């Protein structure tokens, strides 16, 4: 099949949607399908330059849903997208994210293929969607298949776009994170090690992990927090660290993507203190694939993937003391950490990308056959 994956969010913008698109594209092509990605340019430094990754327009980031999103601008976008679709004659156009994105909007408007959309977001309500509903309704009717990565994402999307959704979760490439990945030699001298991976923005909750660190250090004086990511809050976090826990935090800002599994392999406990607006939690899957126990906020999106007491433990959102206590409890119990790591690896195998890709392909085929 000829398949076009469309999103205003893609590398170098880091996050779950970018990961999802890349791995789905990679696996579709691995199975012999002619899959391409349509995404905007984010500037001069574009990772994953490939003839099958088509960059149209320029992305501009803006705050949304306690995070950063992007919208694409370009005077010739409508004509360029129409020309692309006419030339390629795709069988499937698959929107990743939101119908209100610029590329998604024009791709659906001009598409003559079977159209799918995967909703990744979680929000209590969207003023933008409410205002744009009358405009988008005519194009939403062109969607042949609705996918959500979780029941949380489905419930969020169906507030504005009711319909029958297929739940197909996010995936993880277990080969990237398996037990053969070596820990980083530069971190070997630190013990114990706590890991945070994510964008430096309010909803990821790094602030609460930094506030929890003094309590953890009081029990484990040599504890180190390794912070992997990038974002708008970096300067704020660095100031906090300088004043409170300078010797106990190591920043790895925007490391090469290939290094991320090595950070997971190096840690004793993985921590994700997000405060909400998460529909799934790909980083939890990555930690599970790496065999690491997890301390995560007890929020709806994380409950879709993590079982409290099995692959990790929940802590109360926005509560540094409870977060610290849960981390301390795991650091004290090596056997429990190893048990949770094994359970996590078992769950991650169920979300391996070849399995998830097959579920998506089966849904494509089901819809194509139904509409013949």
Model-flagged regions — what are they?
Residues 41, 152, 171:
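Carbohydrate-associated surface elements
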Residues 127, 155, 172-187, 262, ...:
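Acidic anion/phosphate-binding donor-loop and adjacent secondary structure
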Residues 186-214, 226:
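Conserved donor-binding/catalytic core segment of Leloir-type glycosyltransferases
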Residues 238-255:
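Nucleotide-activated donor-binding/catalytic signature segment of Leloir-type glycosyltransferases, i.e.
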Residues 254-255, 262-267:
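Short alpha-helical donor nucleotide-sugar binding micro-motif in glycosyltransferases
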Residues 265-279, 292:
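Acidic donor-binding loop of glycosyltransferase active sites
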Residues 293-296, 306:
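Short hydrophobic beta-strand element within catalytic cores of glycosyltransferases
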Residues 308-309, 313-320, 329-334:
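Conserved acidic donor-binding segment of nucleotide-sugar-dependent glycosyltransferases
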């Amino acid at each position: 099949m000829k398949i076009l994956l469309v999103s205003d969010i893609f590398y170098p913008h880091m996050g779950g949607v970018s990961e999802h698109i890349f791995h789905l594209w990679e696996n579709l092509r691995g199975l012999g399908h002619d899959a391409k990605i349509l995404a905007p340019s984010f500037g001069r430094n574009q990772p994953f330059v490939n003839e099958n990754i088509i960059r149209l327009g320029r992305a501009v980031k803006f705050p949304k849903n306690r995070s950063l999103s992007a919208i694409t601008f370009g005077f010739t976008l409508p004509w360029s997208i129409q020309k692309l679709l006419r030339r390629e004659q795709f069988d499937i156009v698959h929107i990743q994210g939101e119908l209100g994105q610029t590329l998604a909007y024009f791709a659906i408007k001009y598409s003559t293929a079977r159209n799918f959309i995967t909703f990744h977001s979680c929000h209590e309500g969207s003023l933008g969607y409410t205002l744009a509903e009358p405009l988008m309704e005519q194009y939403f009717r062109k969607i042949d298949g609705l996918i959500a990565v979780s029941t949380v994402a489905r419930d969020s999307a169906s507030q504005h776009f009711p319909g029958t959704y297929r739940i197909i979760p996010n995936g993880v490439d277990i080969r990237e994170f398996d037990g053969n990945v070596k820990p980083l030699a530069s971190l070997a001298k630190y013990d114990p090690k706590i890991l945070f991976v994510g964008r430096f923005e309010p909803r990821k909750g790094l602030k609460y992990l930094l506030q929890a660190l003094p309590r953890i250090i009081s029990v484990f004086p040599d504890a180190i927090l390794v912070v992997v990511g990038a974002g708008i809050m970096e300067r704020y976090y660095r100031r906090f660290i300088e004043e409170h826990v300078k010797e106990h935090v190591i920043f790895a800002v925007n490391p090469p993507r290939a290094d991320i599994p090595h950070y997971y392999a190096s840690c004793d406990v993985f921590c994700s203190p997000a405060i909400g607006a998460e529909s799934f939690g790909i980083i939890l899957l990555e930690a599970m694939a790496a065999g690491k126990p997890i301390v995560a906020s007890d929020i709806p999106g994380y409950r879709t993937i993590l079982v409290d007491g099995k692959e990790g433990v929940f802590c109360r959102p926005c509560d540094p003391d409870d977060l610290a206590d849960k981390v301390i409890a795991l650091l004290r119990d090596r056997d429990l950490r190893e048990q949770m790591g094994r359970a996590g690896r078992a769950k991650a195998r169920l979300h391996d990308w070849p399995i998830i890709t097959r579920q998506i392909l089966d849904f494509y085929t089901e819809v194509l056959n139904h509409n013949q």
